[in-house]
Amino acid sequence: MQKKVKVKPNSKQQKIEEQPDGSLTVYLKSPPVDGKANEELIKLLAKKFDVAKSDIRIKSGLSSRQKLIEIDRDV
C-alpha cells in the first residue's frame, strides 16, 4: 500500500490526520535534522498501521515535507 504524506516537523504534539483525498498529514515533534523526523514518522506510521518499522519505506521525498510512503502489510 502506498500513501502520500505531508510532514510538519517541530510541532507541539504528535498526531496523524487523514485528509479527504486519502493522504495523511503527520505532525512530528522532531526537527528535520539528521533524519530524526523521518525516524519519528516511521515509528508513528508503524504504530498506526500495526506493522513493523521495517515494513515501512520512504519511496520518495526523503529530504522533503511531501513524501510517498510504502507500507508492506500481510493481511
From Swiss-Prot:
GO cellular component: cytoplasm
Disulfide bonds listed in the record: none
Annotated stretches, region: Disordered: 1-23
Pfam families attached to this UniProt entry: DUF167
InterPro entries reported for this sequence: DUF167, YggU-like_sf
NCBIfam families reported in the protein's UniProt record: DUF167 family protein
Similarity remark: Belongs to the UPF0235 family.
Name of the protein in its database record: UPF0235 protein Npun_R3528
